[in-house]
Amino acid sequence: IYSAAAYNPTYPNYKNPETGIWDEDKTAIEVYNPLGMLEITNKKIASHVNVNGRVNVEIIKGLNLTGFGSYTYYSLNDRRYIPNDIQQGSMNGNGQAYLKYAERNDLMGNLQLNYAREFGRHSINALALLEAQTQSLFESSTKTSGYETNYFTYNNLKAGANISWGDATSNATRFALLSYMARFNYMYDSRYVVTANVRRDGSSKLGYGNKWGFFPSASVAWIASNEAFMKSLTFIDNLKVRAGYGVTGNQDAIDPYQSLSLMAPNGTTLVDGSATTTFYIDSNPNPDLRWEKKYTFDVGVDLAMFQSRLRLTMDYYASTTKDMLYTYTVPVPPFVYTSMLANLGEMTLSLIHI
């Protein structure tokens, strides 16, 4: 659109009959012949599939076993050809073809055992959960240039005379997460509520010896509006006082294999007269990568009055995040590169929310 709006309108709207190439305004910066740009072939094909299923079995009264599984697939085909008879094509080595393929597979499954019963004024709900998930990613791309004809476009890469180091690449990554969780909830007479949770997660992204994290939490609540002495206050529909404390973990900022020392090819050299690929250290490894943990305390009041026409919620919230994941600047030497992802720093936050 920019080239169409900014291109010199006095230039001819056909190819130069002597050269067979679209005329370009050589004085313009990043403004190309818009008619020539129409000859660029650019095609993207994306596929997305999501399948999930759930099975529930009642073992005995109040005790249920539930299994859930999901699979998500995503792929992208990116195909592009810049012909040799436009300025962009001549700038990219007399025509350029590019192919890229990316594929992602996500698999998740869990088993959940839930028990819920009421005994007079007592109500209990207990849950045990086992969950596993994996994600794999594959990418490849190839780029060639030097095309004497535009007939093949991107359908015949070997028709391009030139391919430079790094123009053909591929990579694959995979990570897994395994979780165990248990929760117990107890309510007495619809007035007093106690909830306790324990969770243990293991991530393949983290350093050896630091892959597992333990994350407990607990909360209590008093539903004061259900007390006998509150019944005379008919304009109050709900009055609940609650407090909770818990620990959560984060490892999303970490890429697969970031705790390891990775090698990557960086060229070729002659060994005994034969071309041999050379490798180098690709990044700073950090075998001490571990879970970032957030410790949270919350106390609050929920109030609803006049048939819930008026609602009020007030909270005091405080949290401390420890072992924060951040990319820090490091000295060279002893490190190979100037930056590294590490667990450092602490952040505290407190607020009152109404």
Language model feature labels by segment:
Residues 1-34:
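Acidic, glycine-rich flexible loop segments
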Residues 22-82, 92-352:
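Extracellular/periplasmic, surface-exposed regions of secreted and cell-surface proteins
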